[in-house]
Amino acid sequence: MRTVTGPTDRVIVVGAGLGGLACALHLAAAGRQVTVVEREPVPGGRAGRLAVEGYEFDTGPTVLTMPDLIAEPLAAVGEKLSDWLELTPLDPAYRAYYPDGSTLDVRTDTTRMAAEIARVCGAREADGYLRFVDFTRRLWHLERDHFIGRNLDTPVDLLNLNLLRLLGMGAFRRLQPKIGEYFRDPRTQRIFSFQAMYAGLAPHDALAIYAVIAYLDSVAGVYFPKGGMHAVPKALAGAAEKHGVTFRYDTTVERVTTAHGRATGVVTADGEHIPADVVVLNPDLPVAYRDLLPPRRSPRRLRFSPSCVVLHIGSRQPYSRIAHHNIHFGTAWKGTFDEVIRRGLLMSDPSLLVTNPTHTDASAAPDGRQTYYVLAPTPNLEAGPIDWRGGMDQRYADELLRVLERRGYVGFRDGVEVQRIITPADWADAGMAAGTPFAAAHTFGQTGPFRPSNLHPSLPNVVFTGSGTQPGVGVPMVLISGKLAAARITEVS
């Protein structure tokens, strides 16, 4: 494994996102002097918080899996997860709604889930589910330590016995045919493959190794932190500060300074130079290269994941039939992926994620009120020539609200008291390449050692963390990326 050369005592981490915070904790545990520089007044990055008229909204991820990956950087400095976060297991993890009117509750207890699938789809599907759980559990255990949890510099790093085991399991086949080995009912096929969208691919294009996302979501368990997802970066930052990490909030980094082929620190917007032995960059990787680092002669062309429109809704209207997380599938399943990913079009028959945080935590809204987070996948700004300015955002939001009312949210529009719309243009303004919060797609050529490295190719003391580098997209992967970035600094080649 390649590591940072030269002194590593003073480290600047640019950005207090989940990856940057995890990295800072691991570095503090290794005795480094760490300063985190963050442009916002609070930590969190994409896992931010929006307060509007008594309503509180998570502005980034809403699904939390694998809390042991939060516990890991805390444990590195001797802290317990339970002292910093109160987590509620969600049961069901999701409630799925299908065009035929049927529903399926996703339970993380395999016995109860098998019974639910048997009730809705029949005994054969339940048997397939149990075999699928066994497959994905083995997949996760093989991938976590030997592929996801390691710094991979070249394809040679993949060559070990576990690669042969993965090949034997069919992990490098396409996801959709692999799902078809276990499930025949389109409803179960959808609930265990829709996660491919967040890896940037349609299920028939994604590799079967990404079935681990379904494992994390629907088998390992989904949790909700008291205070919302923003409570996670608050906890990590609090623990880091307790253990000597310095935080500089409301401070924008303009560029990384270099001399003699090495980074020497960063310059802030007010002209201050902060010296460092190592610089860790948590902003979206392509944007960090574009805005903070010396220009490269031939920047790599990346393929980006789809984006999304998110509606943050504060409402008078409750719906007793829904769960915390709700997935509403449209009729046109394969066609939806084709529209969003290949053709750069908005979904003609939307599939939507509706999260109702006040279902679990009433403190997110005024008394008797509800918060809703509505996510609709859309093309990113490179794939779809959609002008989100000039009223397009409101027109599309209105269309999504009409779709929700047709799908059972009766009177939804009348109950809205607060509405905030986030579009791909807003994601781009927030510093996300191609206007997507899901970073580079997980194509074969952008996975593992082929994904952009977390070590700069010519500045040996610049390291990256976050979803744009290894191992990839999603809260669990970003937390692991922080550990991998720290290992580049603290370990010996």
Model-derived segments and spans:
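N-terminal glycine-rich phosphate/pyrophosphate-binding loop and immediately adjacent elements
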Residues: T5-H141
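A glycine-rich dinucleotide-binding beta-alpha-beta segment and adjacent secondary-structure elements
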Residues: D185-A199, G344-T355, V410-P471
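Active-site-proximal substrate-binding core of FAD-dependent oxidoreductases
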Residues: T258, E491-S493
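A conserved FAD-binding loop/helix module that cradles the flavin
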Residues: P61, S467-T490
